[in-house]
Structure formats: C-alpha cells, structure tokens
C-alpha cells in the first residue's frame, strides 16, 4: 500500500511539473517566473542609456554604486503603485548592463527584464562591426546563446529581443538583417520582439519579414507607435495581431490619451501597451536629469478614468496585455490569438 501511495504521489508531482512548464513564463534578470495577469507592468523604460556610440562606449567605466544611488529613489516611488515588472528596453551597445540591472532588482525587489538584440537606429551608430559582417542566421545564434547561457558570461538572461530600425521608404539592409535575426531567435526561444519603429511606414516591412520567416505578428511589439499620425494604422496592426506600444507617457500626455480613446472606441485596447520611455542615468552627464516612472499612475490614469475608462480596461493595459505580450511562447505564422490564454 505504501508503495502504491508513493507511486501516486510521484505521478501527481510529475503532472504538476508538466503543468507548470506549460504555463506562460517570463525571463527576468533573476530567472524564469510563471506569469499571471495580476501584476502591474511598466513595459518600456530605461535605467541607463549612453548615446556615445559603439566606437566609444566604455561600460567598464560605469560606477555601479553611484548609478544605483542615483536611480534607487525612482524605484522606491514605484512601491506605492505596486509595480512588479519593469522592462528595461536599453539595447546592447547603448547602455545595457546585465549586472547593474541584477543589482537594482535585488536591492529594490522590482523584477527587471533585459534584452538581447541590436539597435540600428541612427544610421547604425550602435551596430558593432562584427554584426555588419555576419548573416542574420549567425547573428541569431549569438542572441540565442545569450538566452541559453547568459549575457557576457553572467547568469543574467534576456527576456525579449530588442531591435531598432530607421524609418525610410525601404528598410536598410542591416535593419532587414536585424528583423530576420530577431525572427529566427524567436523561433528558437519564444522571446517576444520589441522593435524601435515609430511611424507605421517602418512597421509593415518588418511584419512582412516576420511572415516570410514563419513568425506571427503576435510575437512583435510596435515600439513608439504614438509617433504614427494616422490612427487607422492601429486598426490594421491590431487586426494582424501586432502589439501596439504607446510608450512616451513620460514626455507627453495628451496624444497618448487621444490614441487610447481611439483604441477604446474601436475595440482594440486588447492589443495596446503603455509605458513612459522614462529615466535615465546618462554616464556622459555630470548632473543627471532623470524622469520619474510614475506619470502613468499620477496623471494618465486619472485622465483615462475621467474619460470613462473602467477598472477592467486599465487592468488590460497595465496587467493583462503586457503579461501576454512578454510571455515566452513560440508564435508561428499564422497564429491563433485565442489558442493560448493566461490563467
């Protein structure tokens, strides 16, 4: 009888493990976490950014203690608003520092998510020479290895892919390569792709590359979508399954309110993310001018409520949508958005 009970217990434990593995997960700087839709997210922010460019950037000169002392008060402010997840969208060669993010996460208790990928904005100012020479397949192997083994010989692993393109009549060949490499990385890892894009003119060719590579638009976040003037582009992007990120709340409010009202009227709030694109510590400045990460809570949400937004709609923007957007899940083209829902 004891032997039978032990076997039953082992079967129950095995089933529990399998169920746990199938539930959506996120990768933050401290490890993988099982997700639900009850946590508050800031889905596009920055802790440190260094615009000096790939030729001159010197991460080894950054004083972690000084940076942590400067940035911690802004994280302390988040406790009043119960922020659980903080997505640091700073890419490699623009200020990504995995160990710094890990230290801040441990100190503040906020779960920070970092990225792999490369940033082509600014005529490839932040693209290292090796990336210009490699194929998309070779680039993707580097990014996949960061997800498997950690960033720069650390235990910190990325929770999404961050790329960036310049908007033009046609994508620069390097930027086409970045998008394809991101798509290939997604197919191997399930990491969501967040692309600095801006106007919709730069979105459609990226989604076409994803489609050609066999990746669903549901794996893709249209970053800085507030730059688009034609709101009908949001209808098209939402219909395709793309995530639409209005992430400049730290810099401007009225445009974000107008666009969120458009999304509400047209029934597409379930594809929208909101964030500040705020911060950040700049190693090139002696005196820092850091923007807080709280404007959503102190200014935007009261305005949205005054315009008739319900608690459920606000929960959608700050909890449900980002949980789904950053869930690690391979989403091949075509993708049934109803196929997998968070519990």
Predicted regions and their residues:
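Bacterial Sec-dependent signal peptides at the C-terminal "C-region" and cleavage site
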Residues: 1-3, 9-24
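Mid-to-C-terminal alpha-helical segments outside catalytic/metal-binding sites
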Residues: 13, 23-31, 295-343
